[in-house]
């Protein structure tokens, strides 16, 4: 029996909803085997794929161990929980949801502390005055240590946080925090501010590949199929299809359209009758339409694209390159 290809997906909340919607847009329908409470699932039409519904943090751990081939999780969890992450996993594609920043935040009352250099001065002075180090509340222990070391900040100690990190300075369990934030509103509500150069990581959900997984020929082919559909949808999102026909449509006009509007002609130049199909960035549609009509087109049609399949698949090429390293 062939070993299944394992794809790990967040098991609850907005991340699960967004992940399933992402795959659905690529024509990959996920379903749970035993209903909403089951933690196993399938993809319609791909019988050898097993969906593992896990927490985002567990997905990062399983990617490191190689028990899943691909998984969706936040880059913050990858960077925090996997040492030398770039050698063990590959971030195949940022997915545009689950966005948040890991930041260094200090009390707003520290009006003279705006940068990491200022923080270095304050922590050194604090230790000299109080004979102890400043406390940093965080669950991002490794990211904090690496970032502080890169900025030469050494006079601090980490207080591991399991709950509402942003409240630690107010209740006196820490002087400052490192935490993840989307809008910053919660930090402000707790009397905190982000240092000007205190963004450690701009994170989002990623489709991640594991080096340690069993990448058999069958597994690679399954990955190619999945990534081909994702890439086809991503290409379609970049463009609208523009079609027209007029006698003055020639190669020089297409070159000008490409240079001015970023269009591509996926099927080559115009036919003998002047028929042409173009792919155009959405922001340039009306400018391109005016340009074509100014040069002789009577009618220009514009349509949305569902998928654009291409011989080259940059996502699968990225996976292959990573596995060869």
UniProtKB/Swiss-Prot annotation:
GO CC, alphabetical: cytoplasm
Catalytic activity: 1-(5-phospho-beta-D-ribosyl)-ATP + diphosphate = 5-phospho-alpha-D-ribose 1-diphosphate + ATP
Keyword Hydrolase: no
Classification via Gene3D superfamilies: Periplasmic binding protein-like II
Any one GO biological process: L-histidine biosynthetic process
Subcellular location: Cytoplasm
PROSITE patterns in the cross-refs: ATP_P_PHORIBOSYLTR
Molecular-function GO terms, alphabetical: ATP binding; ATP phosphoribosyltransferase activity; magnesium ion binding
EC numbers: 2.4.2.17
Pathway: Amino-acid biosynthesis; L-histidine biosynthesis; L-histidine from 5-phospho-alpha-D-ribose 1-diphosphate: step 1/9
Keywords, comma-separated and alphabetical: Amino-acid biosynthesis, ATP-binding, Cytoplasm, Glycosyltransferase, Histidine biosynthesis, Magnesium, Metal-binding, Nucleotide-binding, Transferase
Family: Belongs to the ATP phosphoribosyltransferase family. Long subfamily.
HAMAP family per record: HisG_Long
Protein name in the entry: ATP phosphoribosyltransferase
Native source organism of the sequence: Rhodopseudomonas palustris (strain BisB18)
Top-level taxonomy: Bacteria, Pseudomonadati, Pseudomonadota, Alphaproteobacteria, Hyphomicrobiales
């Amino acid at each position: 029996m062939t070993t299944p290809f394992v794809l790990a997906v967040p098991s609850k909340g907005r991340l699960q909803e967004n992940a399933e919607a992402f795959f659905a847009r690529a024509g990959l329908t996920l379903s749970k085997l035993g209903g909403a409470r089951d933690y196993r699932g399938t993809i319609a039409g791909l019988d050898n794929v097993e969906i593992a519904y896990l927490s985002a943090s567990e997905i990062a751990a399983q990617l490191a161990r190689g028990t899943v081939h691909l998984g969706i999780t936040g880059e913050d969890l990858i960077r925090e929980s996997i040492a030398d992450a770039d050698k063990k996993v590959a971030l195949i594609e940022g997915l545009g949801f689950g966005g948040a920043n890991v930041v260094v935040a200090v009390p707003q009352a520290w009006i003279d502390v705006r940068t990491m250099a200022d923080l270095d001065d304050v922590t050194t002075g604090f230790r000299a005055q109080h004979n102890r180090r400043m406390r940093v509340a965080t669950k991002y222990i490794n990211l904090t240590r690496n970032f502080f070391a890169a900025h030469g900040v050494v006079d601090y100690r980490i207080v591991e946080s399991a709950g509402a990190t942003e409240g630690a300075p107010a209740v006196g369990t820490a002087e400052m925090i490192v935490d993840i934030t989307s809008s910053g509103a919660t930090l402000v509500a707790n009397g905190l501010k982000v240092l000007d150069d205190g963004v450690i990581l701009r994170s989002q959900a990623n489709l991640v590949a594991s080096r340690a997984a069993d990448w058999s020929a069958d597994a690679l082919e399954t990955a190619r199929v999945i990534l081909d559909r994702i890439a086809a949808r991503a290409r379609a999102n970049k463009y609208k299809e523009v079609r027209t026909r007029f006698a003055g449509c020639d190669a020089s006009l297409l070159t000008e359209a490409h240079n001015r509007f970023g269009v591509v002609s996926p099927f080559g130049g115009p036919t003998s009758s002047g028929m042409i199909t173009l792919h155009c960035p959405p922001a340039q549609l009306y400018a391109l339409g005016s340009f074509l009509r100014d040069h002789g087109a009577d009618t220009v049609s514009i349509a949305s694209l569902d998928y654009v399949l291409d011989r080259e698949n940059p996502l699968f090429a990225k996976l292959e390159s990573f596995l060869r390293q």
